[in-house]
Amino acid sequence: MEYQYPLDYDWSNEEMVTIVKFYEAIEKAYEKGIIREELMGLYRRFKEIVPSKAEEKKIDKEFQEVSGYSIYRAIQRAKEVEEQKVVKI
């Protein structure tokens, strides 16, 4: 995809890499499918970096505007899927 991920320049380089991996996992959930544990593990790390619900919603909105993919919908779907199953939207 040719778009710029929403990033906060206050994040460290390591945190930015983690956030980009999370965005890529959301894309994968929409495009091919991703194992639930992989997605939820990246989401937990994302929440360590972005603990605020308001900030998470802001990032989700920005990400959805550039990619067309919803972080919220992907995570809700992952919570519905059994362990070791593929999350596909």
Swiss-Prot record:
InterPro entries: BH2638-like_sf, UPF0223. It comes from the Bacteria. Belongs to the UPF0223 family. This is UPF0223 protein BCG9842_B1176. It comes from Bacillus cereus (strain G9842). The lineage of its organism: Bacteria, Bacillati, Bacillota, Bacilli, Bacillales.
